[in-house]
């Protein structure tokens, strides 16, 4: 009977949970801000892990354009500390080397949602305007 998930996928899921907790409770760098771990990809030999993060501060109107690069830089600077805490939290022979990448799927999803909302609103306005013209 085959396993549903490979060991790498199970380790990645557990790492995602643990790194999220570490970022929330242990990392005090203000550049990290409201970082959320959206996914983790682990190499087959579990030596490397790519951690995808989103920053919820990006969604605000007056967001700093350097927020994402500064946040990723802060996470890269703290990767050794995060890796140490991850090693204590998880029982792995070798703790993967962490690299951080920005995941813009949340921002893109919000943008797409806004586009759809605007199209529906414009369509409703056109229908009401054409309905008014036909009645006159």
Swiss-Prot record:
Gene3D superfamilies (alphabetical): 3.30.300.20
GO molecular function, one term: ribosomal small subunit binding
Top-level division of the source organism's lineage: Bacteria
Keyword annotations from UniProtKB, A to Z: Cytoplasm, Ribosome biogenesis
An example Gene Ontology biological process: maturation of SSU-rRNA
Primary location recorded for the protein, binned into one broad class: cytoplasm
Pfam families assigned to the protein according to its UniProt record, in alphabetical order: RBFA (PF02033)
Localization, UniProt: Cytoplasm
HAMAP family linked to this entry: RbfA (MF_00003)
Record PANTHER family: RIBOSOME-BINDING FACTOR A, CHLOROPLASTIC-RELATED
Summary of subunit composition and partner proteins: Monomer. Binds 30S ribosomal subunits, but not 50S ribosomal subunits or 70S ribosomes.
The family this protein is said to belong to: Belongs to the RbfA family.
Protein known as: Ribosome-binding factor A
Native source species: Serratia proteamaculans (strain 568)
Species lineage: Bacteria, Pseudomonadati, Pseudomonadota, Gammaproteobacteria, Enterobacterales
